[in-house]
Swiss-Prot record:
Gene (UniProt): fabZ
Catalysed transformations (reactions): a (3R)-hydroxyacyl-[ACP] = a (2E)-enoyl-[ACP] + H2O
Enzyme Commission number: 4.2.1.59
Name by which UniProt lists this protein: 3-hydroxyacyl-[acyl-carrier-protein] dehydratase FabZ
GO biological process, one term: fatty acid biosynthetic process
The organism's taxonomic lineage, starting at the top: Bacteria, Pseudomonadati, Pseudomonadota, Alphaproteobacteria, Hyphomicrobiales
The organism of origin for this protein: Chelativorans sp. (strain BNC1)
Length: 156
């Protein structure tokens, strides 16, 4: 690779997301990954619809996507980076470890197309830390720092 040239960006449709992530309905919260740059960054898409089960109770008269699910969408997008990388080192699982500085700025509602931007900011061994943002219509709706552990062993 020539100096100053970054590797080609990848894009993953839903079928490839399903091959990559272990999550399934109703907990798969990434519909597409429009950009994944090696083990550095990714942009995921979550198309929010009123048909999702959490909207039956959160809240029936004014549906709002729960903040914890926005964080989970961030974790799944970051997890895609980890799992892409893990293919080379063969860990069996990626664990979500921490959430720091989570902020929710605006509700995410049915009909929104949420972009999830994640960027690896630190790596120490098998623990990776990511800066994450959720964006709707060009505006930041949530942000958090999260960390994950790539593990070669299943828990007991």
């Amino acid at each position: 690779m020539a100096d100053g040239v970054s590797p080609a960006m990848e894009s993953l449709d839903i079928l490839n997301v399903l091959r990559l992530l272990p999550h399934r309905y109703p907990f798969l919260l990434v519909d597409r990954i429009v950009e994944i740059d090696g083990d550095n960054s990714a942009i995921g898409i979550k198309n929010v619809t009123v048909n999702e089960p959490h909207f039956m109770g959160h809240f029936p008269e004014r549906p709002v996507m729960p903040g914890v699910l926005i964080i989970e969408a961030m974790a799944q997008t970051a997890g895609a980076i980890c799992i892409q990388h893990a293919k080379q080192i063969k860990p069996s699982v990626v664990y979500f470890l921490t959430i720091e500085n989570a902020k929710f700025r605006k509700p995410v509602v049915p009909g929104d197309r949420m972009e999830i931007h994640v960027k690896k900011v630190k790596q120490r061994g098998m623990i990776w830390k990511f800066a994450c943002e959720a964006i709707v219509d060009g505006g930041k709706v949530a942000e958090a720092m999260i960390s994950a552990l790539l593990s070669a062993e299943e828990p007991e």
